[in-house]
Amino acid sequence: MDKIKIYYDGLEVKDDIRIKGYTTNPTLLKKYNKSLKDLILPVIKKLPNTPLSIEVNSDDSDSIISEVQEILSWGGNIYIKIPIINTKGELNLKIINNLLNQNINVNITCVFSKLQIDQIFNNLSINSYNKLIISIFSGRIADTGISPSILCKYTVELFKEFSNIEILWASTREVYNIFDAINCGCHIITIPEQIYEKLSLIGKDLNKYSKETVQQFILAGQSL
């Protein structure tokens, strides 16, 4: 796993050198029943230099700008997560360009299609002074019966000349997606808690795993 950076999808700080960053979204934060600031500040205090992607919860430009200013005032190594489109399906590239031109690190999220990737490539003010993450929602793409690897490989190839741009495999569904992402050339993959808990299974002896599974089923049957 040294070929890709693993970001944890959540705010439970892990004492684990494999975790290189953290990401959040409004759905994840909802379960904590706290304000965004109260959730983020303790993480920044513990990990001031670790990349932390925080998604805005606004849908119009003025509200997004106001929210971004508030988030950046907290310090830390913040990436502002902006969806590629708003709830009306309109591109957010104007506000994203605005942030990039201010040398604010951005994570473009909720990316699903080649059209969106091409729109990013053709319309963004990309330079070497700011850092940009492009988050492809691979798991949700796979849910539709389409391989996300095609889009990920295309995106990696398209942006390969930009050392400040990283492609992220998001919406991870299973441990093997880590190796899918590596094979695509992705720089980062996010993993939720249920995948993090399974990392210890990597490299496990399959014959032993088979035996343990049979034992588990027998125990379950005996308890009926």
Language-model features, listed with the residues they occupy:
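Catalytic alpha/beta core domains of metabolic enzymes, predominantly
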Residues: 90, 97, 104-197, 203-221
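Aromatic-anchored helix/helix-loop segment that forms the rim or "lid"
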Residues: 224
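Active-site beta->alpha loop and helix N-cap motifs at the rims of alpha/beta catalytic domains
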Residues: 2-105, 138-141
